[in-house]
């Protein structure tokens, strides 16, 4: 049984009092990726055509790989497709905000023409495509996931590409008056420095009612060289002069950013502070399976995360934390309360496999402390 610490108790109590009974909605915009996710399982042992046992954990998968390496033998896995869904930053956050009663728009790599999974799910929303989507095979385990990704048009997307496909006037129409803009993933977008520059220099000056917040998901920057990341840091920090930039990263993404800042630590809070200092943005959120941190110039908030031993879905739990964090910024909640909302959206998602309605979010946040007892 987990026991929430006093800081988490205070944060949950304050969040329960701070969340409004209902939201008025409003426009939000998400760019610039776009994925079609094929959810899969590895087969451990097959009893019949219809019956099999899956490889239960990443540890079990790693053990098989290591055994094969030690034996100097090749290795074969059978895998089962357990569904197809739209994925990536734009899909997960647009889906979550749509379900909570907002009006999301999507500017992303959705296909030429827009591919059917995106049309089927998001055809009622404003959609602008930037080219071919990426494809991800997401292999689910009880303790995590293995994601095999083909990136698509995002790999070469730059500011000129966005301008030529969407047009500055149309992009301004979608952004002006929006409550928030979300952007992801930096790691899949080598030209992000140029896109951040274009947003700051060419788009934001044209807006009469710009969003107050831009949420940036860096993704796994370990796949990008330090020089590439450094160029992005410079432009992301400069973008913060035009709009409040909130960067949100998981534990291992945060650790990489901290190491780029010269900080080696096993303390998640210290790593989050180092990432914040390195990026030069308004806020940095580090989210993990045990705790989450939100850092800004005024200080740091830390909140415990209620875990579940029986998750329905873990792939994209971080995106759903980001959806809650984004909502909290739209609602202008405090640091600790924002973390509770992020954890509540993610917590509902991993337990049910779908994002919450706003009422379901409020119910989870209201019972936040009870979920520690249920772990």
Swiss-Prot record:
Phenotype caused by lack of the gene: Grows as wild-type on sucrose.
Catalytic activity field: beta-D-fructose + ATP = beta-D-fructose 1-phosphate + ADP + H(+)
Pathway: Carbohydrate metabolism; fructose metabolism
Keyword Transferase: yes
Known regulation of activity: Activated in the presence of 0.5 M KCl. 85% activity at 3.5 M KCl. 60% activity without KCl.
GO biological process: fructose metabolic process
UniProt entry keywords in alphabetical sequence: Carbohydrate metabolism, Kinase, Transferase
GO MF annotation list: identical protein binding; ketohexokinase activity; protein homodimerization activity
Disulfide partners: none
Gene3D superfamilies per the UniProt record, alphabetical: 3.40.1190.20
Residues engaged in binding beta-D-fructose: 319
EC numbers, comma separated: 2.7.1.3
Database matches in SUPFAM superfamilies: Ribokinase-like
InterPro entries xref list: Ribokinase-like
Function description: Catalyzes the ATP-dependent phosphorylation of the ketose sugar fructose to fructose-1-phosphate. Does not produce fructose-6-phosphate. The sugars D-glucose, D-galactose, L-rhamnose, D-xylose, L-arabinose and D-ribose are not substrates of this enzyme.
Subunit architecture: Homodimer.
Family from the record: Belongs to the carbohydrate kinase PfkB family.
Name this protein carries in UniProt: Ketohexokinase
Organism: Haloferax volcanii (strain ATCC 29605 / DSM 3757 / JCM 8879 / NBRC 14742 / NCIMB 2012 / VKM B-1768 / DS2) (Halobacterium volcanii)
